[in-house]
């Protein structure tokens, strides 16, 4: 008798960026050529709301349903990106270069609604995060071993004030596949936010 194995998917929920914002952020990657870092591909730049890990098909369908419901009751809003810096904050040695955004009330309401809805479902494996969260984009991941070889006073300063804004009109259910050339992301479902009335 054949045994069928449910597919496992590496899933996260994200805010994807408009092309012009991706291009402007990718342009900053050439500003620090001396930095030992793996830069994020332009097409992969995004803001992660929640990383959900590996899910089977049934769990994925439930996550999709929840995400659509949450999106439909939260209105469009804007995000302002204001700084490029090492991240996470206070982490030594730094692990990444981040683009940080302002934490608006609309962003907080959306993320809290999503977290609450996922946590109260008995059909998906989800644990709320007990840490403060602000919107950020991983611009690149630092090669730690190479970073440690650089004398502290010679390590490049990454602390750039920027001013980029964009409107968020949807959130996306994303699948990440780990390939030899790096992660490949696929949008599984686009969940539109509620239009302003």
Feature locations, PLM:
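Histidine-dependent nucleotide/RNA phosphoesterase domain, centered on the 2H-phosphoesterase fold
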Residues: 2-197
């Amino acid at each position: 008798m054949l045994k069928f194995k449910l597919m496992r998917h590496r899933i996260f929920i994200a805010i994807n960026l408009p092309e012009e914002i991706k291009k402007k952020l990718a342009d900053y990657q050439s500003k620090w050529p001396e930095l030992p870092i793996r830069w994020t591909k332009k097409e992969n730049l995004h803001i992660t709301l929640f990383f959900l890990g590996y899910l089977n098909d049934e769990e994925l369908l439930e996550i999709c349903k929840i995400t659509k419901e949450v999106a439909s009751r939260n209105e469009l809003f804007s995000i302002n990106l204001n700084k490029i810096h090492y991240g996470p904050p206070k982490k030594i040695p730094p692990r990444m270069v981040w683009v940080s955004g302002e934490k608006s009330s609309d962003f907080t309401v959306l993320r809290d609604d999503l977290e609450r809805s996922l946590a109260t479902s008995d059909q998906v494996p989800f644990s709320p995060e007990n840490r403060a969260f602000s919107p950020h984009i991983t611009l690149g991941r630092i090669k730690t071993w190479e970073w440690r070889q650089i004398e502290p006073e010679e390590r490049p300063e990454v602390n750039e004030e920027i001013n980029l804004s964009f409107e968020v009109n949807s959130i996306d259910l994303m699948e990440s596949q780990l390939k030899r050339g790096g992660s490949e992301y696929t949008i599984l479902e686009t969940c539109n936010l509620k239009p302003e009335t």
